[in-house]
Structure formats: structure tokens, C-alpha cells
């Protein structure tokens, strides 16, 4: 994640009441101080928080949530140094979602981000709370995220970077660099397609020349029938199938029906595709074989080498 994430859709509503009930049995500390609780109850709450966070973050291998939960009772002038440890994140959950209590975070001395929503931010950032004068109105706990290894990160737009991974988990698009074994019916050597989780293919480039017109096919076999053969009217001669029932990009248990296909529209999105093409030029040592069979007599076999780059792009 970035250094700050604001949760403004009630993601933690399911455990807010549990925190309020836990507070009722907590022995209060001196006035204007926080109380840290660790018990079997907080372990259960931490487990719930972990499950919620897993749904929020992509490409995360492991999430650790401390079972130490702090009920905060600072006023606006208190310092907020809770620990000397600046590795990981703080998660702040408001006990009630009134807009009076605010979290102020300072990414730079000249910049302040103010939020009255549940929020998670890096421990390395300076922060304070505002309008926390009476009672315990929010809780804090420590979070540690471990990400799955990525090949690299590339810029998607002015404010966002995307991880490029060789793992299907938590991703929804696959950029496939496809090299074709020589065959007298095939006119191409390399094409690149973007495959969504329904199996639809967007033709991106061939020989590293990018298409500006968006050609979308329901499957890689459909793309091949339309694009790679020298013969005219190929559809009248044979059809293609994969005898293993495999998709070119995804394991069958990862496929989902009814997905909308991502289509580049803006200059930033086309620049992103160009960067993806450049990454593929220099990271193409690992590949899988994919085979399509034409129903001729005897069968015609087409063999492809496929290098896969997985990304997660929110576009629905």
C-alpha cells in the first residue's frame, strides 16, 4: 500500500461494536492517557481486522495484526509518539463515526492530511489527533504487511504505481508475450495480448509495435483465427482448441465470467502499455508452453511460448 490509506466505506463497521463492548470492561487509566489491552478478546478482534485487510490489499503475502489494542484518550495538544518502532503501519478505527474527531497526518512539514474516517498510515509519519478531549473515541493497533515479490513497479498515472508480478494471486489482468514456433500457416513471430479473468484478449502489440485500435476477442483461439494466419477465410478450413482445457493466462480456478475488459483510453493508459512492453523486452526468460490444435486430418498443432506478467488494475 501507499503510506496512507483511508477507509471511507465502513469497512470496519462489523467490529466497531465489538470494540465498544470491549471498552466497557477495560479498566480505565489516568485521565488524558491511552489504555492498551491484550486478551483473548483482542486476539479475536485482530483476526477479524486481518480478514478485512486481506480483502483490501492486493499482492499481500501476509498481514500481521498486533493483539495489543490501544484505546486513545489524547487531547489535541498531546504528542502522539506511541512507540519508537517506525516499521509497519498504524490502523486507527473510530469507536463512533462522528466527524468531530480527526486524524492529522503530516507526510511533509508543509503538508497535512486530515481525516475523520478509519485510516491506516505508516509509522514513519508524524501525526496527531484533534478533538479527542473526553472519553475514549478511537483505537489504534499495529499492522505489518509482507508483499509478494514483484518483478518491478511501473507508473500507471501521475499518482499511482502498479506492481508487475509473475503470480496470479490477487491480480486481474495478464500481459502475455507470445512467441510462436515456426509454422507455414503463421505469418507472425511475436504478439502480445492483455488477458482478463474471463479469458477475453486485448491485442496490444506485435513485434513491439503497439496497436492504437483496440481489438478484443473472446478467447486466444478466436484471436488466432482472426489475426495470425496467412490464409484467407481460415474459419472455413478449421477451428482451434486446447486439448487440455487450459486458458493461456490463467489457471481454470482463477477464471471468472462476466468481467468487463480493460480498454486503454487516455494518454496515461497508453503510456502505461508502452512501459509494460519495455519491461517485457528485458524480463522474458521464464515461459510456459501453450498448444492449440486445429481440427484438420491429420491434426495441425500450433505451439506457443508464453511469458506472463500479472497486474491488478481497478477498472470496473
Curated annotation (Swiss-Prot):
Top-level taxonomic group: Viruses
Biological processes per GO annotation: symbiont-mediated suppression of host NF-kappaB cascade
One Pfam family of this chain: Pox_C4_C10
UniProt main location, coarse: host cell
Location of this chain's protein in the cell: Host cytoplasm; Host nucleus
GO cellular component: host cell cytoplasm; host cell nucleus
Induction: Expressed in the early phase of the viral replicative cycle.
Keyword field: Early protein, Host cytoplasm, Host nucleus
Main function: Plays a role in the inhibition of host NF-kappa-B activation. Mechanistically, blocks the subunit p65/RELA translocation into the host nucleus.
Family: Belongs to the poxviridae OPG031 protein family.
Protein name: Protein C4
Gene (UniProt): OPG031
Amino acid at each position: 500500500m501507499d503510506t496512507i490509506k483511508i477507509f471511507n466505506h465502513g469497512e470496519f463497521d462489523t467490529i466497531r461494536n465489538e470494540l465498544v463492548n470491549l471498552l466497557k470492561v477495560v479498566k480505565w487509566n489516568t485521565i488524558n492517557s491511552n489504555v492498551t489491552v491484550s486478551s483473548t478478546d483482542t486476539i479475536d478482534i485482530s483476526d477479524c481486522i486481518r480478514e478485512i485487510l486481506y480483502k483490501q490489499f492486493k499482492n499481500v503475502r501476509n498481514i500481521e495484526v498486533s493483539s495489543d489494542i490501544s484505546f486513545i484518550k489524547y487531547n489535541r495538544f498531546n504528542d502522539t509518539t506511541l512507540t519508537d518502532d517506525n516499521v509497519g503501519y498504524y490502523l486507527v478505527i473510530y469507536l463512533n463515526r462522528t466527524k468531530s474527531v480527526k486524524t492529522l497526518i503530516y507526510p511533509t512539514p508543509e503538508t497535512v492530511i486530515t481525516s475523520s474516517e478509519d485510516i491506516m498510515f505508516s509509522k514513519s509519519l508524524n501525526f496527531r489527533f484533534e478533538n479527542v478531549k473526553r472519553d475514549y473515541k478511537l483505537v489504534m493497533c499495529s499492522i505489518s504487511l509482507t508483499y509478494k515479490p514483484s518483478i518491478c513497479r511501473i507508473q500507471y498515472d501521475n499518482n499511482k504505481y502498479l506492481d508487475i508480478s509473475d503470480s496470479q494471486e490477487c491480480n486481474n489482468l495478464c500481459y502475455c508475450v507470445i512467441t510462436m514456433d515456426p509454422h507455414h500457416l503463421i505469418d507472425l513471430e511475436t504478439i502480445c495480448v492483455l488477458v482478463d479473468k474471463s479469458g477475453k484478449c486485448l491485442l496490444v502489440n506485435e513485434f513491439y509495435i503497439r496497436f492504437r485500435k483496440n481489438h478484443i476477442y473472446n478467447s486466444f483461439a478466436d484471436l488466432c483465427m482472426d489475426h495470425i494466419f496467412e490464409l484467407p477465410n481460415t474459419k472455413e478450413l478449421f477451428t482451434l482448441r486446447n486439448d487440455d482445457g487450459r486458458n493461456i493466462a490463467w489457471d481454470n480456478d482463477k477464471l471468472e465470467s462476466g468481467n468487463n475488459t480493460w480498454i486503454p483510453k487516455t494518454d496515461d493508459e497508453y503510456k502505461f502499455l508502452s512501459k509494460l512492453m519495455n519491461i517485457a523486452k528485458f524480463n522474458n526468460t521464464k515461459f510456459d508452453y501453450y498448444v492449440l490444435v486445429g481440427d484438420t486430418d491429420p491434426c495441425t498443432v500450433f505451439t506457443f511460448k508464453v511469458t506472463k506478467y500479472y497486474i491488478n488494475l481497478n477498472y470496473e
